[in-house]
UniProtKB/Swiss-Prot annotation:
InterPro entries the UniProt entry points to: SAICAR_synt/ADE2_N, SAICAR_synth, SAICAR_synthetase_CS
UniProt-listed GO biological process terms: 'de novo' IMP biosynthetic process
EC number: 6.3.2.6
Keyword ATP-binding included in the entry's annotation: yes
Pfam families: SAICAR_synt
Catalytic reaction list: 5-amino-1-(5-phospho-D-ribosyl)imidazole-4-carboxylate + L-aspartate + ATP = (2S)-2-[5-amino-1-(5-phospho-beta-D-ribosyl)imidazole-4-carboxamido]succinate + ADP + phosphate + 2 H(+)
Protein keywords: ATP-binding, Ligase, Nucleotide-binding, Purine biosynthesis
Pathway this chain belongs to: Purine metabolism; IMP biosynthesis via de novo pathway; 5-amino-1-(5-phospho-D-ribosyl)imidazole-4-carboxamide from 5-amino-1-(5-phospho-D-ribosyl)imidazole-4-carboxylate: step 1/2
Gene Ontology CC annotation, any one: cytoplasm
Matching CDD domains: SAICAR_synt_Sc
Protein name as it appears in the record: Phosphoribosylaminoimidazole-succinocarboxamide synthase
GO molecular function, one term: ATP binding
């Protein structure tokens, strides 16, 4: 459900976020409680999910040593009360048309590509790697930004160079890996493994690279508990994998390959998913989510 904000013009929508124009220089980014899986936006919301993602992004924007798009505090007077705690005032940027992905461990689409080719996005990897293998060094694996309902497509670094030029492509790769390394160290100190993550960047009027959108949330990242980590096994996670597993399990009755809309999630799955998101925020930040501003809508 899209928030109706009479003071601002709604200019775009994503799977989870709604964007409104404040003025010529600023946007209001509102994070809803929607959840997506397998390129579908589900009919069931996860209560407080938007607030958790906003809280976590705000925490990391403060901690990470890199320019970001925030243009005001989280209780900025320009944020309407009904979206307080799930909205940010952001600078307008010229957004880079690639997802910038850093992988420190092999899993997900990266594992599938490796099993087929021995490489991920053109980066050759050693033989014998398996599910959850730790890579010798984190790798940069960009992807195209897909429209709602389409798949992001992993691409090689050469594609980024061709589209954006060598200088900007190299800046993106360097920034992505540096930020990932900062965040992975922070996660490790909290007993978590940051397996992989994706960033979005934009350019300001001076051509400076700026970290934008969300950062290091359970929607954009794979966090695993360090305790019990074992190479070769699927790791428990603090993201929406729990929802994916239910959708593809026998209880849902849904076939992800037939093009039909996924079924509504049962209450137990909704509650467990919310709990995972909240736990991720609290473990990373050391703060209580109950103290975060705003209320569930």
């Amino acid at each position: 459900m899209r928030p109706e904000l009479s003071d601002y013009e709604h200019i775009s929508a994503g799977k989870v976020r709604e964007i409104y124009e404040i003025d010529a220089e600023h946007l209001l980014m509102v994070v809803t409680d929607r959840i997506s899986a397998y390129d579908f936006v589900l009919d069931t919301d996860i209560p407080d999910k938007g607030r958790v993602l906003t809280a976590m992004s705000a925490y990391f924007f403060e901690q990470i040593d890199f320019p970001n798009h925030l243009a005001g505090p989280l209780d900025d007077e320009r944020i309407p009360e009904e979206v307080l705690g799930r909205a940010m005032v952001c600078r307008k940027l010229d957004m880079v048309p690639f997802e910038c992905v850093a992988r420190g461990y092999l899993t997900g689409s990266g594992l599938k590509e490796y099993e087929a080719t021995g490489a991920v996005c053109g980066v050759k990897l050693p033989e014998g790697l398996v599910e959850a293998s730790k890579l010798d060094e984190p790798i940069f694996t960009p992807a195209t930004k897909a429209e709602i309902g389409d798949h992001d497509e992993n691409v090689g670094f050469d594609v980024v160079v061709k589209d954006l030029g060598e200088d900007l492509a190299e800046r993106l790769r360097t920034a992505t890996l540096e930020i990932y390394s900062q965040a992975a160290k922070m996660a490790e100190e909290k007993g978590l493994i940051l397996a992989d993550t994706k960033f979005e960047f934009g350019l300001d009027k001076e051509g400076n690279l700026v970290l934008a959108d969300e950062v290091l949330t359970p929607d954009s990242s794979r966090y695993w508990p360090a305790e019990g980590y074992e190479e070769g096994k699927v790791q428990p996670s603090f993201d929406k994998q729990f929802v994916r597993n239910w959708l593809t399990g026998p209880k849902s009755g849904w076939d992800k390959n037939d093009g039909s809309q996924p079924p509504e999630l049962p209450g137990s799955v909704v509650e467990a998913t919310r709990a995972r998101y909240v736990e991720a925020y609290e473990r990373i930040s050391g703060k209580r989510f109950a103290d975060w501003i705003g209320s569930c809508v």
